[in-house]
């Protein structure tokens, strides 16, 4: 089966990017090197093509009413022009996907529209789960992205750069805010969607636009010395920022409480949602494992599947691990037995048959200081 390609694939080739298969897409893992790309985002700005991600449109009269049962988070906690990070759960409280829902307000035919930005590896599962569990006579669900491009402009300079490109201020838009509008000088007939969101721990924007407009933004960014970045730097940046990767840190066997995402579960809202009974029980009785951060001595990297030990006892398993260019140390996430999941608890990590000292930390290793 041929790999899917982004509309900006030719830009990868021009840049001699190193390409890999990611969730059925041929995507750049790096352009100029992971460390350089990572540091560019931390110090100034980087540009990512994230067109592999899925974008689902849900339209209807009050569509939040119909999709609320798919989510443990109160969908009326955000309104038009805002986004909400949440999780979609199965009937046992396991995480089908983590995603962002955006409220676009009233669009065509006086119908309200929601956009769901979902993980590439989960798009088909998400789409079918939504269709199978909703009354499709009341709402419509479509692939919103089609041949559009999804870009992420990330870093402390990203807002200034984007304002220069659109020739307009975005200072009034809050974090997780979004807009869907036409910029006449860029494309007089095309609405561009953008949001103040990202996966790096920095200020950033995620932008959905046509191929022509995307090439315009790409070329503009490169002319301003913005570093094109691949999925490798995206992974190290999100790990430093304490953000989950679906399929590694969360899956259908992990619950929001175990993953440190209990704040997304609004039991007090009293709405019915898939997995509610299971999560009520976890809330009452507690959990057996918990996702934590790990700082590891030396330069050995704890990868997915490495055991975490306390003495001779196996107390957990690493889900994600990398060298942190910012912290200059090996870092990881791991699910640890809750009795041992204490901040500053010293543990050992088994890496290729050798034991390395580690310390349990908060999951976020980096926080921006501006």
UniProtKB/Swiss-Prot annotation:
<dbReference type="GO" id="GO:0004047">
    <property type="term" value="F:aminomethyltransferase activity"/>
</dbReference>
<dbReference type="Pfam" id="PF08669">
    <property type="entry name" value="GCV_T_C"/>
</dbReference>
<dbReference type="InterPro" id="IPR027266">
    <property type="entry name" value="TrmE/GcvT_dom1"/>
</dbReference>
<dbReference type="InterPro" id="IPR006222">
    <property type="entry name" value="GCV_T_N"/>
</dbReference>
<keyword id="KW-0032">Aminotransferase</keyword>
<comment type="subunit">
    <text>The glycine cleavage system is composed of four proteins: P, T, L and H.</text>
</comment>
<keyword id="KW-0808">Transferase</keyword>
<dbReference type="Pfam" id="PF01571">
    <property type="entry name" value="GCV_T"/>
</dbReference>
<comment type="similarity">
    <text>Belongs to the GcvT family.</text>
</comment>
<dbReference type="InterPro" id="IPR006223">
    <property type="entry name" value="GCS_T"/>
</dbReference>
<dbReference type="GO" id="GO:0019464">
    <property type="term" value="P:glycine decarboxylation via glycine cleavage system"/>
</dbReference>
<dbReference type="InterPro" id="IPR029043">
    <property type="entry name" value="GcvT/YgfZ_C"/>
</dbReference>
<dbReference type="GO" id="GO:0008483">
    <property type="term" value="F:transaminase activity"/>
</dbReference>
<comment type="function">
    <text>The glycine cleavage system catalyzes the degradation of glycine.</text>
</comment>
<dbReference type="GO" id="GO:0005829">
    <property type="term" value="C:cytosol"/>
</dbReference>
<dbReference type="GO" id="GO:0005960">
    <property type="term" value="C:glycine cleavage complex"/>
</dbReference>
<protein>
    <recommendedName>
        <fullName>Aminomethyltransferase</fullName>
        <ecNumber>2.1.2.10</ecNumber>
    </recommendedName>
</protein>
<dbReference type="InterPro" id="IPR013977">
    <property type="entry name" value="GCST_C"/>
</dbReference>
<dbReference type="InterPro" id="IPR028896">
    <property type="entry name" value="GcvT/YgfZ/DmdA"/>
</dbReference>
<dbReference type="InterPro" id="IPR022903">
    <property type="entry name" value="GCS_T_bac"/>
</dbReference>
């Amino acid at each position: 089966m041929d790999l899917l390609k982004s509309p900006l694939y030719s830009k990868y080739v021009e840049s001699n990017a190193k390409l890999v298969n990611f969730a059925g897409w041929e995507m750049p893992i790096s352009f100029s090197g992971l460390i350089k790309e990572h540091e560019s985002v931390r110090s100034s700005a980087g540009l990512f093509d994230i067109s592999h991600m899925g974008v689902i449109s849900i339209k209807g009269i009050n569509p939040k009413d119909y999709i609320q049962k798919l989510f443990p988070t109160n969908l009326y906690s955000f309104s038009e022009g805002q986004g909400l990070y949440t999780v979609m759960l199965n009937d046992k409280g396991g995480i089908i996907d983590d995603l962002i829902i955006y409220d676009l307000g009233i669009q065509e035919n006086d119908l309200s529209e929601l956009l769901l930005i979902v993980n590439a590896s989960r798009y088909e599962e998400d789409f079918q789960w939504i269709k199978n569990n909703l009354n499709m006579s009341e709402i419509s669900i479509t692939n919103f992205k089609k041949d559009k491009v999804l870009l992420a402009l990330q870093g402390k300079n990203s807002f200034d750069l984007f304002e220069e490109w659109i020739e307009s201020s975005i200072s009034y838009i809050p974090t997780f805010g979004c807009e869907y509008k036409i910029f006449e000088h860029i494309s007089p007939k095309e609405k561009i969607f953008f949001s103040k969101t990202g996966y790096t721990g920095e200020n950033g924007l995620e932008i959905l636009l046509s191929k022509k407009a995307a090439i315009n933004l790409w070329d503009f960014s490169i002319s301003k010395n913005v570093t094109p970045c691949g999925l490798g730097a995206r992974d190290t940046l999100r790990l430093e920022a304490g953000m989950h990767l679906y399929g590694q840190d969360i899956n259908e066997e992990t619950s929001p409480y175990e993953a440190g995402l209990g704040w997304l579960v609004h039991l007090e809202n009293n709405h019915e949602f898939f997995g509610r009974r299971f999560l009520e029980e976890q809330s009452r009785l507690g959990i057996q494992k918990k996702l934590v951060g790990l700082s590891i001595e030396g330069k050995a990297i704890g990868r997915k599947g490495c055991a975490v030990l306390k003495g001779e006892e196996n107390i957990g398993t690493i889900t994600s691990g990398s060298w942190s260019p910012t912290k200059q140390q090996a870092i990881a996430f791991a699910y640890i037995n809750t009795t041992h999941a204490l901040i500053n608890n010293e543990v050992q990590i088994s890496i290729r048959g050798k034991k390395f000292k580690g310390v349990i930390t908060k999951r976020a290793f980096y926080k921006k200081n501006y």
